[in-house]
Structures are given as C-alpha cells and as structure tokens.
From Swiss-Prot:
Core subunit of the mitochondrial membrane respiratory chain NADH dehydrogenase (Complex I) which catalyzes electron transfer from NADH through the respiratory chain, using ubiquinone as an electron acceptor. Essential for the catalytic activity and assembly of complex I. Pfam families: Fer4_7. HAMAP family: NDH1_NuoI. Gene3D superfamilies: 3.30.70.3270. The keyword Transmembrane does not apply. Binds 2 [4Fe-4S] cluster. This is NADH dehydrogenase [ubiquinone] iron-sulfur protein 8, mitochondrial. Its cofactor is [4Fe-4S] cluster. The lineage of its organism: Eukaryota, Metazoa, Chordata, Craniata, Vertebrata. The keyword Oxidoreductase applies. Residues 102-131, 141-170 form the 4Fe-4S ferredoxin-type domain. It catalyses: a ubiquinone + NADH + 5 H(+)(in) = a ubiquinol + NAD(+) + 4 H(+)(out). Belongs to the complex I 23 kDa subunit family.
Amino acid sequence: MRCLTMPTLLRALAQAAHTGPPGGRTLHSSAVAATYKYVNMQESKTDMKSVTDRAARTLLWTELFRGLGMTLSYLFREPATINYPFEKGPLSPRFRGEHALRRYPSGEERCIACKLCEAVCPAQAITIEAEPRADGSRRTTRYDIDMTKCIYCGFCQEACPVDAIVEGPNFEFSTETHEELLYNKEKLLNNGDKWEAEIAANIQADYLYR
C-alpha cells in the first residue's frame, strides 16, 4: 500500500467532498469550492538547489545568526530608554505629584482656610480645622491629607483661590509605613518650601491656560 503524504491526502479528501458519492448530491458546488484556499498543501521542491538550500539553513543555523545580527545592530543605535534614577525624563508643568502648601514671599501662609479643597476632594482625603486670628483673618490650625486616599485629580489645586495647595513636581516619595503617608500641615509646608522654585515656574508656565 502506497503511503500518502499529507498534502496528497488533503487533496484527495477535498476531491471526495466535491464529487460526492456515486449518484448522490455533491457536498459543495464547484463555484464555491473553487474559492477555497487550502493551507500547507504545497509540497516542498525536490530539486537539488532547493534541497541544498534547506540543508544549509538547517545545518549552518542561518536563521539563528540572522536574529543575532539584528540584536547586535541595536547596540550601535541611540537608546530609547534612560538610565533611571540617574537620568530623568522631562515633566509637564501640569504634572500632579506630591502635595505642598505654599507661602507668600514674606513667609506668610497662603492658605485662608476657605475649605474649598476639602469640599471638592472626591476621595475625602483632606481634613481642615481653622480659627480666626486677632486681626480677623482665618488660618488653619490643622491641614491633613491622607495620601493613601488621594487620587491625584488636581481638584484641590484648581479650587484654591490663592494657589496655596498645589501638586508639585516630586513623584519620588515612597515610604515604608502607612503612617508616613498621612501628611500634616508641617509636612505640607516643608514640601512647599523645598519645591517653591519649581512650583512657581510651573504655575507661571501654565498661567495662560488656567
């Protein structure tokens, strides 16, 4: 019995499905069958050149060396990544990072305890307590932000009428404990003092679009 190759067997099955049993109806019309595309039915060529080429690709690993050549070519191209944390990419002036409370150049706190940021915060992450001063102005006695609740939407910064609470450019403030992410007024003011130059520059750069 002659052993049939897979492509030959597939062609025989397709022919049988097309012609059908003697005296019976065909399974497929010739017009439809003519449009069929059979996958992997092409037999490999057996001439000397084709056989030699296949043997060379198999024995000499040409595909492997072609892949290695592609990999080595990228060693001489400009890298698409940066060496973080020693190199850092640019940040938008609208970047929303770690929170900070700002002061006026005189050193006076900007916050007027209007509590708009506390009211607008969708995560209810801000807690403010305030009392009036002798001159009638209001200032905060407590300004807490639970950074584990914050979703960095920027609503607090948008709602503030005096640019007191802002989200600065710092994004490297990971901690080892939960308690370190519960910011109080002192922590927020220290952040503002530390990043004031960058914060002021970002606000100025975005001034026309606010």
